[in-house]
Amino acid sequence: QPNRLVAEMPELREMDFGKFENKTADELMNDPDYEQFIKGGLDNPPPNGESTREVINRCYEALNIIISDMMYEGLTNVAVCTHGGLIMNMLAGFGVPKRKPMDYACDFGEGFEVMVTASMWQRSNAFEVIGTYPPKYEEMPDYTVEDYYTD
């Protein structure tokens, strides 16, 4: 496929869940460390794992590399494929409109479309979230031209 470059970025790896890695919530339900972890917070990592703040910092590093490369190479469209937790944290941390991470949850094979300008990123470390991918259209009523011009 012409004009397609795939670059693996370690900054976009999934969150390190430490001692909770590869365990289900049911398996961890009576673990006091897990009970503490699910209370949330930016600086509340699982034992031997990574905090949300550390994940967001990694996301910033990745986005800075991606956006800088886009500007340098003159690219106007790129796709970033990564884990759902990173998608949610990237969009909540750097996306406009500002929303909670869970508001940016998506299923496998889904994601969001964002738009960024050099000045927006350089001045604000922000990008605009403009839609879902693939697009999800809400049911819209059918209108005729006459419907738009009647009182």
List PLM regions with ranges.
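Short glycine/proline- and acidic residue-enriched helix-loop micro-motifs
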Residues: 33-54
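Generic structural signal for well-ordered alpha-helical scaffold segments
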Residues: 56, 60-71
